[in-house]
């Protein structure tokens, strides 16, 4: 198979093992852990061209390229990573990883627990936070010999990690890109996460998280959780254009099977997701979202938290994103401007809702490329607080 000219092509994941204990915010300790990583491009001699990609809730290390010749689907952010793309692998060395607690090769609930005869951790895997993830990413940086990232980039939950980087390790990144994100979750967002969790926890096949030991799987719960989440990722306009009130069979069936196209879509998305994701991981990821709040240690003042930062910022929001509305990004921007920090902000008119950050929208791609490439048309110091 021939890959597109702007693709990174075939990529091979690498597993990094860390034998030192990892002390977590929850008070527990992982005796050792592993991180699954992919890299694209070439690290230059002085290691100054490295970009870290932080993934969202259902993301992982496979951000670009293909694993096999017959792969039909590229990495989750292939639209932005590759030769000549916004994150140009001809210029940058790009690092993507699967966070701990995940289910794509890094240490998580499906991994063997060395303190329990190497049985899967399951529900015994500790709850982890965005700060824990950033700590492990810093450890990975050390392993790679990268003292300072040229940029740390992330969308949604990934954007929260990028923001945490700027607070916890202000001397270790030059640029921070926060896309379709928020400084902390609203009560509404926490509520959506709780409904998703209860869908899983109430599934009879969940078995208190020990479904692997029971040779079972809470598939129905995970499908429902994904369906709820997916509704929040799309805008009303996107759903209207994609489905409207179209019927699958063209007429009412007067029953509870799938009738509307949007129902069929949600069930399909849930089904596909349930085949590739772990239920315990889903629970962990949603709690990490709920706990995120970099202002907590600064008197709950985001302005005070952002005063510690030293990098340049690009904050991007999308007009139809109601999961993390533009006003949430503006909170970050205002806190940075109050501190006279260099920040560029763009609210992009896009119809895809929260998922817009995954699409190669021309203005979005142009802005990201310009910010990373240092083009002068981004007048970061000229912004005024809204």
Curated annotation (Swiss-Prot):
Site positions per UniProt: Important for acyl-CoA specificity: 323
Protein's organism: Acinetobacter baumannii (strain AYE)
Catalytic activity line of the entry: L-homoserine + succinyl-CoA = O-succinyl-L-homoserine + CoA
Group of enzyme by EC: transferase
A molecular function GO annotation: homoserine O-acetyltransferase activity
Record-level GO cellular component terms: cytoplasm
Highest taxon of the lineage: Bacteria
Cellular location(s): Cytoplasm
Pfam families assigned: Abhydrolase_1
Active site location: 156, 321, 354
InterPro entries: AB_hydrolase_1 (IPR000073), AB_hydrolase_fold (IPR029058), HAT_MetX-like (IPR008220)
Main location: cytoplasm
PANTHER family, A to Z: HOMOSERINE O-ACETYLTRANSFERASE (PTHR32268:SF11)
Family: Belongs to the AB hydrolase superfamily. MetX family.
Pathway as given in its UniProt record: Amino-acid biosynthesis; L-methionine biosynthesis via de novo pathway; O-succinyl-L-homoserine from L-homoserine: step 1/1
Domain AB hydrolase-1 positions: 49-358
Name of the protein: Homoserine O-succinyltransferase
SUPFAM superfamilies in UniProt: alpha/beta-Hydrolases
């Amino acid at each position: 198979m021939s890959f597109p000219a702007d693709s990174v092509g075939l990529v091979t994941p690498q597993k990094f093992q860390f034998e030192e204990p990892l002390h977590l915010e929850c008070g527990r300790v992982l005796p050792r852990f592993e991180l699954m990583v992919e890299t694209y491009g070439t690290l230059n001699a002085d290691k100054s061209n490295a970009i870290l990609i932080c993934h969202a809730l259902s993301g992982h290390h496979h951000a670009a390229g293909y694993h096999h010749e017959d792969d039909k689907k590229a990495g989750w952010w292939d639209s932005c990573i590759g030769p000549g793309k916004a994150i140009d692998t001809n210029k940058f060395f790009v690092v993507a990883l699967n966070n701990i607690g995940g289910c794509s090769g890094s240490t998580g609930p499906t991994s063997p627990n060395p303190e329990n005869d190497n049985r899967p951790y399951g529900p015994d895997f500790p709850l982890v936070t965005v700060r824990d993830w950033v700590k492990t990413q810093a450890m990975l940086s050390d392993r790679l010999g990268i003292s300072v990232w040229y940029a740390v980039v992330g969308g949604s939950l990934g954007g929260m990690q990028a923001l945490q980087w700027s607070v916890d390790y202000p001397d270790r990144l030059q640029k921070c890109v926060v896309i379709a994100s928020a400084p902390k979750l609203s009560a509404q967002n926490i509520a959506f996460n709780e409904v998703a969790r209860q869908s899983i926890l109430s599934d009879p096949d969940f078995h208190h998280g020990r479904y692997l030991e029971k040779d079972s799987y809470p598939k129905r719960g995970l499908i429902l959780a994904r369906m709820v989440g997916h509704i929040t990722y799309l805008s009303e306009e996107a759903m209207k254009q994609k489905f409207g009130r179209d019927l699958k069979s063209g007429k009412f069936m007067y029953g509870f099977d799938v009738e509307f196209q949007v129902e069929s879509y949600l069930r399909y998305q849930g089904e596909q997701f349930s085949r590739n994701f772990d239920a315990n991981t889903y629970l962990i990821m949603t709690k990490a979202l709920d706990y995120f709040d970099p202002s907590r240690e600064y008197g709950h003042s985001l302005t005070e938290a952002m005063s510690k930062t030293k990098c340049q910022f690009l904050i991007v929001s999308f007009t139809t994103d109601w999961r993390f509305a533009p006003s949430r990004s503006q909170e970050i921007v205002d806190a940075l401007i109050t501190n006279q920090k260099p920040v560029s902000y763009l609210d992009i008119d896009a119809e895809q809702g929260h998922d817009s950050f995954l699409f190669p929208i021309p203005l979005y791609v142009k802005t990201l490329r310009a910010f990373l490439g240092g083009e002068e048309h981004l007048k970061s110091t000229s912004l005024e607080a809204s």
